[in-house]
């Protein structure tokens, strides 16, 4: 949703828009004036969705039995709802991809990559690895009557190295949480996690 001053969802004044003009449309109430100060919205924020239950079931079935019609059925139910072609075979990479696109902007990615032990491979600190680089989508409105894009919003992807010069680096020690000393003192069977 573009909310810039000249965007299609123009705010009432320039104090009510963000710097880029972008908001994530997912779970956003687009009713006019829904976000106005002093008014509320009836849009609920989901904590757990049916798609999450399907993806958990697909992953568990795949881990227990390998690629089965059961796990494929769960994935294809989500793909059908989204209007995407069904898969004929299932790999672990398909499950990773489905989680990434289904839960985009919902805060699942970090935890998924930790659970699958993939975070250190994807965010490996290599400046040549696109997955380890921060990128941004930059919009601008073309105002040139001689241009074919006149009056249209154009977007380009920009590498954010001038703002965030270092690539994302997830180290093995980041997989482990820390036990509080009180827990360790109260239970002699608990041992500290590595890197703690």
Describe each PLM feature range.
Residues 37-40, 45-47, 79, 87-196:
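Long, intrinsically disordered, low-complexity segments
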Residues 1-49:
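Flexible, polar/acidic helix-loop-strand segments at domain edges
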Residues 19-32, 70-73, 80-83, 100:
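Charged alpha-helical initiation segments
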Residues 16, 23, 29-30, 53, ...:
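General helical structural elements
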Residues 44-78, 93-102:
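Extended, hydrophobic/aromatic-rich amphipathic alpha-helical segments that build helical scaffolds
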């Amino acid at each position: 949703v573009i909310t810039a001053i000249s965007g299609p969802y123009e705010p009432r004044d320039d104090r009510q828009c963000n710097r880029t003009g972008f908001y994530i449309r997912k779970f956003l109430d687009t009713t006019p004036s829904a976000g106005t100060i002093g008014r509320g919205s009836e849009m609920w924020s989901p904590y757990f969705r049916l798609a999450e239950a399907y993806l958990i079931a697909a992953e568990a079935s795949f881990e227990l039995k390998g690629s089965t019609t059961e796990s494929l059925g769960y994935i294809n139910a989500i793909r059908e709802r989204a209007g995407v072609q069904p898969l004929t075979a299932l790999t672990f990479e398909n499950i990773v991809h489905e989680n990434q696109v289904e839960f985009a902007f919902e805060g699942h990615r970090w935890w998924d990559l930790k659970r699958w032990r993939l975070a250190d491979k994807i965010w490996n600190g290599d400046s040549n690895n696109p997955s380890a680089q921060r990128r941004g989508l930059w919009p601008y409105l073309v105002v040139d009557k001689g241009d074919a894009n006149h009056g249209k919003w154009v977007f380009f992807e920009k590498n954010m190295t001038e703002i965030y010069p270092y690539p994302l680096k997830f180290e093995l020690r980041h997989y482990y949480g820390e036990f509080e000393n009180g827990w360790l003192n109260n239970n002699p069977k608990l041992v500290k996690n590595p890197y703690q």
